[in-house]
Amino acid sequence: MAPSLEEPTAANIDALSKTAPNLVAPEPEHCPGPESEQAGKGDACAGCPNQNICATAPKGPDPDVAIITERLSQIRHKILVLSGKGGVGKSTFSSLLAHAFAANPDSDVGIMDTDLCGPSIAKMMGVEAETIHVSNAGWSPVWVTDNLGAMSIQFMLPNRDDAIIWRGPKKNGLIKQFLKDVDWGELDYLIVDTPPGTSDEHLSVNSLLKESGVDGAVIVTTPQEVSLQDVRKEIDFCRKAGIRILGLVENMSGFVCTNCGHESTIFRATTGGGKRLAKKMGIPFLGSVPLDPRIGQACDYGESFVDAFPDSPASTAIKQRSNGFGVYGMEKCDTIFKTADLADTREY
């Protein structure tokens, strides 16, 4: 089908899905897992690029997992924010979500930046120049407000523009320190902002948090197929890793003029967008967040967009539950996520 700027029809979308290529080769089967005694030694490991790493890695349960579980036992809800591709607004959404939770003065909120090579949460929260303080209780998070704390590698850099050039083991070690040593105290919500894709950081966070209990993951996308194709991989990763998918959020879904209120489509959903994908993959669609240039300005200045522009359509989408995902004054994550929009079967 030739490229076109016209709105795609349902027939065109179905035709695209039918012609989608299959994997050239099936994925490896019967992997014993990195913690197994047979890791790197079994017949299924032959030819695997990670065979030597698995064979030489220490086996058995990680003793730090019990320490992390105890440390995080006072946190009621832990939410991962994932994206298949960079640039879809995952960290922006994480910061908006944190501010929206913290808008309830009775809620205590933490946000942890595990995107070690591209940390942006400190900047978005307006605390980029702060440093970590260490006490007998552990590392103290940087408090943005009385009920909103943040933790990021940015607080540890000698110079704010220093690059992080680390391999997997060193990244995993710092993530473990964030989970084991940071003294969050009692929190209602801990939001974990992750790097794009499915990398070492995701595996580390999942394995270290599994015992302490994670509510699940929110996946952020934009409407274009180039983003959705990576979301499918992210969904596959979550299912294989045993991470509950709370739902899909479509960011930058359109632009609403602040003067006349007219909504314009910026990134056309050539294959049906996030809602169609969520329906097809059997996960909740949590709603859409429109573009607003003031979001970028608020993030650059480290201000809460939700507080500064409470009547913006984007703020409304975050606060008042767009298609089943409401965060403003939320009492329990499960109550909201269980009522997310799985039943809407409209075609796009």
From Swiss-Prot:
Cofactor: binding details: Binds 4 [4Fe-4S] clusters per heterotetramer. Contains two stable clusters in the N-termini of nbp35 and two labile, bridging clusters between subunits of the nbp35-cfd1 heterotetramer.
Compartment list: Cytoplasm
Keyword presence, RNA-binding: no
Sequence segments annotated as region (Disordered): 23-42
Principal location class: cytoplasm
A GO CC annotation given for this chain: cytosol
Binding site residues for [4Fe-4S] cluster 1: 31, 45, 48, 54
Protein residues bound to ATP: 84-91
Family classification: Belongs to the Mrp/NBP35 ATP-binding proteins family. NUBP1/NBP35 subfamily.
Protein name, as recorded: Cytosolic Fe-S cluster assembly factor nbp35
Source organism of the structure: Aspergillus terreus (strain NIH 2624 / FGSC A1156)
Upper lineage: Eukaryota, Fungi, Dikarya, Ascomycota, Pezizomycotina
Gene: nbp35
